[in-house]
Amino acid sequence: GNSEVGHMTIGSGRVLYQDLVKIHLAIKNDTLKDNVIVKNTIEKSNNIHLIGLASDGGVHSHIDHIIALAKIAQNKNKKVWLHLITDGRDVAPDCAKIYIEKVINICNENIKIATIGGRYYGMDRDNRWDRVELAYNAIANATPKTKDNILDFIDNSYKNEIFDEFLIPTALDGYDGIKDGDGVIFCNFRSDRARELSSVFAKDDFKEFSVKKLKLNLASMTQYDKNVKI
């Protein structure tokens, strides 16, 4: 973190919760499901896609937020596809399976892991669009695809000395991409590394690489860019 938070809140005379804590509290108090944006996005969408950094590093995201949203969408009788971005920076470089196994524990007929890929690709912030394109293609187009289960995919990547931050964005068998009428919720609460990937889906005039023109319902845990409508 930085000192800005302290400078902004000194003298406010009350507790000002930061985004991580706010979302944690909403989950604990069972009020996240009542959030207007979350509720509307889920209710008006066919399938729900959750995209987020899958760790408990707490800098950009928290795995518990992804899990909570998946359960909320499932309770609305939605099919939920999880797009898990592996960390390797805010946590150890080779501990993704700890978090993936936590997600596997909630998976069932309605909640499935769709894609996996390292933050090097899905969370770029320096306009390296070739990286972002690989993340987008896995999420939107289910390309490339692996027959391996997700834990074997991670193990095989490790054998090739490709660790969590750099896992190649890949779709899992059974996932066929995002469709018209689906909802996409970006689960990271910190904006700087969520801005690029989310803009690919949100900008009508996106031109950095070829994208599918889809009618999607988009939402994010916080505002990433006031000039991009999510």
Residues of each region from the PLM?
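Active-site nucleophile/metal-coordination loop of metallo-enzymes that catalyze phosphate/sulfate
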Residues: 1-120, 128-130, 134, 206-230
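Short hydrophobic-aromatic micro-motifs
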Residues: 10, 186-187
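Conserved phosphate/oxyanion-binding catalytic-loop motifs
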Residues: 190
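Extended acidic, low-complexity intrinsically disordered regions
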Residues: 182-183
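Long, well-ordered, tryptophan-enriched scaffold segments
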Residues: 91-179, 194, 202-208, 212
